[in-house]
């Protein structure tokens, strides 16, 4: 048992299963926990299929999503694995980023080959910034013909290349989740082989503290005799006292200033880092120079923009969304990080309207600039009510 207390030092990676309905995503998830439980019992509990299948609902950015979270460890890593029972849940999870993935296991039934949702999930993985994919060719016990197997593998590789993944070099592992779950030793070994491929082909993600500093401003106030303080949660990076920062977004001009103090829970700190809620004392800045919704950044690392292309999921009526479709020139509020900015929507050519429950591609023109990068997530709101959620795919200007 002494081994377990070292687990904090293991690299942590977030992954998930994606792929067509009934190709065996949930069975594979359960089977992974079983073979790892059998191989390294003191680190891994077994999570049965039923427990994953009845995934609890979560609310993320005003959208309800069913997501199952499973944890397990290989010899070298600690994994958090997400699996969604329904196809709609996948779309919502990918677009809202409810559960960010550092890599995905694409499950394709060898008996069927790639199907429409296989394509859709790979496209969503590309759009939502899932960087790496490992393929599990499932139900391999049901295909005797080696040529069919090779054909399916080829199709999957072509599909991955089509969506700008590394189709030529991506690992494709033949598995039978059901057989492994039933305790078949040979198929259990193949599943361990799949996890070895995941260990070796999904790189360790860069930690938030290693990225350039960024903090969205939540509040601004004046402390008599000390100056202006802005508060917020540091999204990424590290900031030290006396460093220079830029304040960008909302206004047309950026402001450059020096941080003369960093406070947390009324204590003074030498530095603040990703995940911490802090107050920053800014030199020579008046209360009216800064506002909620702007971002404080390491100079030159992010720029404000007004026009971008996005992919968005629009809530259905049952989810508390709109009851009617919207058309070109729709003008909702786009909520980025800590503030709403009005934007005008232009639909993709050939799209007349967007129905509640759809996922849509659109171009947005904001009336004020927002500090953004590709991959930034937002919520679409009308009068404070969430009607959709999306992600910046490409910045135009």
UniProtKB/Swiss-Prot annotation:
G2: annotated span: 62-66
Domain tr-type G as annotated: residue spans: 10-206
Gene: tuf
Subunit structure: Monomer.
Protein role: GTP hydrolase that promotes the GTP-dependent binding of aminoacyl-tRNA to the A-site of ribosomes during protein biosynthesis.
Main location: cytoplasm
Family per record: Belongs to the TRAFAC class translation factor GTPase superfamily. Classic translation factor GTPase family. EF-Tu/EF-1A subfamily.
Protein name stated in the entry: Elongation factor Tu
Parts forming coiled coils: none
Record bears the keyword Protein biosynthesis: yes
Lineage, highest ranks first: Bacteria, Bacillati, Actinomycetota, Actinomycetes, Kitasatosporales
Chain intervals for the UniProt region annotation (G3): 83-86
Intracellular or extracellular location(s): Cytoplasm
Reactions the enzyme catalyzes: GTP + H2O = GDP + phosphate + H(+)
The organism of origin for this protein: Streptomyces cinnamoneus (Streptoverticillium cinnamoneum)
Binding positions (GTP): 19-26, 83-87, 138-141
């Amino acid at each position: 048992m002494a081994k377990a207390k070292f687990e904090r030092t293991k690299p942590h990676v977030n992954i998930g299963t994606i792929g067509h309905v009934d190709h065996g995503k949930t069975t594979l998830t359960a089977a992974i926990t079983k073979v790892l439980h059998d191989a390294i019992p003191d680190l891994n509990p077994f999570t049965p299929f039923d427990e994953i299948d009845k995934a609890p609902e979560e609310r993320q950015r005003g959208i309800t999503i069913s997501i199952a979270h499973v944890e397990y460890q290989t010899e070298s890593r600690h994994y958090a694995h997400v699996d969604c029972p329904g196809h709609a849940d996948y779309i919502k999870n990918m677009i809202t980023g409810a559960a960010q993935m550092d890599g995905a296991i694409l499950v394709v039934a060898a008996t069927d080959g790639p199907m429409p949702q296989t394509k859709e999930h790979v496209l969503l993985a590309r759009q939502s910034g899932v960087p790496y994919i490992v393929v599990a060719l499932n139900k391999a016990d049901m295909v005797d013909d080696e040529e069919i197997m090779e054909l399916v593998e080829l199709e999957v590789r072509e599909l991955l290349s089509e969506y700008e993944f590394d189709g030529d070099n991506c690992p494709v592992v033949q598995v039978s989740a059901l057989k492994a779950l039933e305790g078949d030793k040979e198929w259990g070994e193949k599943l361990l082989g799949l996890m070895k491929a995941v260990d070796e082909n999904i790189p360790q993600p860069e930690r938030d503290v290693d990225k350039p500093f960024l903090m969205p401003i939540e509040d601004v106030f004046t402390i008599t005799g000390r100056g202006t303080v802005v508060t917020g949660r540091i999204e990424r990076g590290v900031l030290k006292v006396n460093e220079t920062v830029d304040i960008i977004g909302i206004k047309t001009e950026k402001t450059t200033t020096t941080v003369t103090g960093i406070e947390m829970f009324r204590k003074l700190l030498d530095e603040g880092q990703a995940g911490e809620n802090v107050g920053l004392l800014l030199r020579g800045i008046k209360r009216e120079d800064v506002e909620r919704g702007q971002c404080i950044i390491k100079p030159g690392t992010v720029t404000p923009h007004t026009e971008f292309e996005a992919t968005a999921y629009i809530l259905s009526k049952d989810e508390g969304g709109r009851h009617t479709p919207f058309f070109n020139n729709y003008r909702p509020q786009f909520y980025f990080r800590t503030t709403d900015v009005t934007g005008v929507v232009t639909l993709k050519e050939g799209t007349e309207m967007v129905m509640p429950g759809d996922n849509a591609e659109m171009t947005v023109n904001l009336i004020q600039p927002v500090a953004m990068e590709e991959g930034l997530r937002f919520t679409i709101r009308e009068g404070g009510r969430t009607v959709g959620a999306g992600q910046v795919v490409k910045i135009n200007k």
